Swiss-Prot record:
Species: Schizosaccharomyces pombe (strain 972 / ATCC 24843) (Fission yeast)
Gene name in the database record: fsc1
Record keyword Transport present: yes
Protein name: FAS1 domain-containing protein fsc1
Disulfides per UniProt: none
Coiled-coil segments on the chain, per record: none
Biological process annotations from GO: macroautophagy; protein transport
Length: 728
């Protein structure tokens, strides 16, 4: 009896328990399909299960969980989700990431992720993007989790990488490699991890097409190919191997909810992708696997084509970063395939200090005129702001260092020094000298040190310059006096000239010595004494093939130019005809200054001898004054000088108007004086009229207004009446 009572009581308790726990989805059916069929809210899902032939699968297999969308999740009958993604082979939702029955092309299961409300603080658990509105609807064959929406498949890995700013560098590098794998676990460093390890130059190289193999190697340090590893797969530590055999360890601390890779915590984990998962890390894994070289750095700073040639022709130099050297590389737009690679390499290089230059020996061999094989030189200067110039005209636009190697990208290509004329033809400041060398056929001399005169010095010669241009024999003697046998470099800004006797190409021997100038001088000049004449060297060591050029600020003629030659060269032969007419040509070249006015043919016939004598100046007898570009003779008005020529035989001055006679001067002075006086009187009269008119009107107006301003007394009025009577 007691046993029967106990059984009856147990039955009653079980009945009450089931009654209290019952909800609208509860049923006594034994299969998942029967559960769904019992509720009209799943009619659309059942039709899709039937079309996809999944009904037998759900009826036949046990221990499954189906995430079942309500009819409201299918607003359009055309929506056909892959329902295998809604089925997982477990009834226990005891982990965040669950592998579904949907498989990738390599047969691995695509996962979904549960976001539990206890962790998120939401009202419902979520699976990917859908909310679980009713959980754990159980059947004998499995469990149904009712959801309010269609479950989105995980996005492709590249979509996640491109959408996150922190992944931008990894995305840019990996875009060519990630998509080729059906299953992959990615250990993605954030952008700061790259910036902490690599310089801008190194990143620029990695972004280039030349870095494909290096980038692939680096990316493969951060992906586990053909493996889908989620955090809860490694609650017990596991070791995984990359394709190159290097291994890493992974461990998930479930209590701390942290995933560790090589004992370093990830910043995020289990970001699901269609091909696997992304775990983010704050540092690179094995970054040292990539070795950077000078050739790679050249690519990073914009000289990729030069880098390719360097790697082909000088492979040992392209990878050596321990030797102290400089590599001068033209930028891509200035690159030429016929480039002399060795001329761009300098061993034992130190950059000159600001505002200094130095000559450096390059690696290229340059045969000279006598068959000697020497290394070609290159001239490198540094500007005040640290900018670098190569062979004067070429500028460095970017620089970088790797190990002991200095790399410079140039805006133009450089080549070994060319013959004199070819090398200097584009140097504007000595265009006169270069043209004269070409005209005289002097450009082919070898093993010569040239002191070339700047254009400004030639133009300062005035009429003498015209004489030289018209007399090539004289011009050649001048040019040869500034060309010395042998190559004499300064070597650098800090080197002094090696004083001594030097032989010119005209077989003269000159003493050349440096001139000391106080180093504390504010405007210190670079001076040389050549044959007792002081010159300022304005540019040192311009390199040419088999020679060197220094630019100087003036020219000294080895002879005296006659006044007659200067007058002829200036095109004023009428003045010579006038002198010849009066047999006065012998007065030229006597040391007297000659002022040459502009004359016509008729002037030669009409002017008298006094006119000619007036323009040949004896400074001891006449007052001759020059001020700037004007002259005056015997206190005459200033006359503008149009051109001039200086010579030991006498200077020549070209003017437009003739020097006036003393009588003309007196009349001119008188006229100017009278004109000045009349002008002064006129101004005074005008001022008086203006003054009188203004103040008279002012006083009259005041007198007229006075009765209105103040009433007069009776005596005053009477006096005014009397005065009026008298005036009538």
């Amino acid at each position: 009896m007691n046993l029967q009572f106990r059984l009856y009581l147990l039955f009653i308790l079980l009945f009450i328990s089931f009654a209290n726990g019952k909800n609208e989805y509860e049923d006594k059916s034994t299969s998942i399909i029967d559960l769904l069929s019992s509720k009209s809210q799943f009619s659309k899902l059942i039709r899709r299960l039937q079309r996809n032939r999944l009904v037998p699968y759900l009826n036949r297999n046990k221990g499954l969980t189906l995430f079942a969308p309500l009819n409201e999740a299918f607003p359009d009958d055309s929506i056909e989700p892959n329902l295998l993604y809604y089925i997982v082979n477990t009834t226990e939702l005891d982990r965040s990431v669950l592998r579904t029955q949907l498989k990738s092309s390599d047969g691995q299961q695509i996962a979904l992720k549960i976001h539990y409300k206890a962790e998120t603080g939401r009202a419902y658990d979520k699976v990917n993007n859908a909310q679980i509105v009713q959980s754990n609807w159980r059947a004998d064959s499995g469990v149904v989790q009712v959801i309010d929406n269609i479950i989105d498949l995980p996005p492709p890995a590249l979509e996640i990488l491109s959408s996150e700013k922190d992944f931008s560098i990894f995305h840019r590098l990996s875009v060519a490699w990630v998509g080729e794998y059906s299953s992959v676990t990615m250990l993605v460093p954030d952008s700061s991890a790259f910036l902490n390890v690599y310089t801008n130059t190194e990143l620029a190289y990695l972004y280039s097409m030349y870095a494909a193999e290096d980038v692939k190697t680096l990316i493969h340090q951060h992906i586990l190919v053909n493996q889908r590893v989620y955090a809860e797969d490694v609650i017990e530590p596991k070791t995984f191997h990359y394709k190159n055999g290097i291994s890493i360890s992974m461990k998930f601390d479930k209590d701390q909810k942290k995933l560790f890779i090589n004992d370093v915590s990830t910043t995020k984990y289990d970001l699901l992708t269609f091909s696997g998962a992304i775990h983010t890390v704050s540092s690179l894994i094995n970054p040292e696997i990539i070795s950077f070289t000078p050739a790679k750095y050249l690519i990073g700073i914009g000289a990729a084509w030069f880098s390719e040639k360097l790697s082909r022709e000088r492979k040992s130099i392209s990878v050596d970063k321990t030797s102290k050297r400089a590599i001068l590389a033209p930028t891509n737009w200035a690159y030429r395939e016929i480039i002399d690679i060795d001329y761009h390499i300098i061993e034992n290089f130190d950059l000159p200090a600001p505002n200094k230059y130095a000559l450096y020996v390059t690696n290229i061999k340059s045969g000279n005129s006598v068959g000697e094989d020497t290394n070609a030189l290159v001239r490198i200067a540094t500007g005040s702001a640290g900018e670098m110039y190569v062979n004067v005209e070429t500028r460095s636009i970017q620089s970088e260092n790797i190990g002991n190697v200095s790399l410079y990208v140039l805006d133009k290509d450089i080549e070994p020094p060319q013959p004199l004329l070819s090398q200097l033809i584009l140097v504007d400041e000595i265009s006169f000298s270069v043209r004269y060398l070409a005209s005289l056929g002097l450009g082919d001399y070898t093993k010569v040190t040239w002191f070339l005169v700047k254009n400004s010095a030639w133009t300062q010669l005035g009429l003498v310059h015209l004489v030289l241009q018209q007399n090539l024999e004289l011009l050649e003697s001048v040019m040869l006096d500034y060309a010395f046998e042998g190559i004499a470099f300064y070597g650098s800004s800090d080197e002094a000239w090696a004083s001594g006797n030097y032989t010119t190409l005209s077989n003269k021997e000159f003493l050349i010595e440096g001139v000391y100038e106080d180093s504390n001088s504010r405007n210190k000049r670079d001076l040389l004494r050549i044959n007792n004449e002081i010159y300022e060297v304005q540019t040192r060591d311009l390199l040419v093939k088999d020679g060197v050029v220094h630019l100087v600020d003036k020219v000294k003629l080895p002879f005296s130019v006659s006044q007659k030659d200067m007058i002829i060269a200036g095109g004023r032969k009428e003045f010579l005809e006038l002198l010849d007419k009066f047999e006065m040509l012998d007065m030229l070249d006597s040391g007297y200054p000659v002022v040459v006015p502009s004359l016509t043919g008729s002037d030669v016939n009409t002017k008298d001898s006094s006119f000619a004598e007036r323009h040949i100046i004896d400074p001891e007898k006449r007052n001759f004054v020059i001020s700037g570009s004007r002259l005056s003779v015997d206190s005459s008005p200033w006359i503008s000088i149009q051109d001039y020529g200086y010579s030991e035989l006498g200077n020549v001055y070209f003017v437009q108007n003739a020097i006036p006679t003393k009588r003309q001067n007196r009349w001119r002075i008188t006229f100017i004086s009278i004109s000045g006086l009349l002008l002064s009187v006129g101004i005074c009269v005008l001022c008086y009229k203006i003054y009188f008119k203004f103040f008279r009107n002012r006083f009259m107006n005041q007198g007229e207004r006075e009765p209105l301003l103040a009433p007069a007394d009776s005596d005053t009025m009477a006096g005014r009446r009397n005065s009026s009577s008298l005036s009538v």
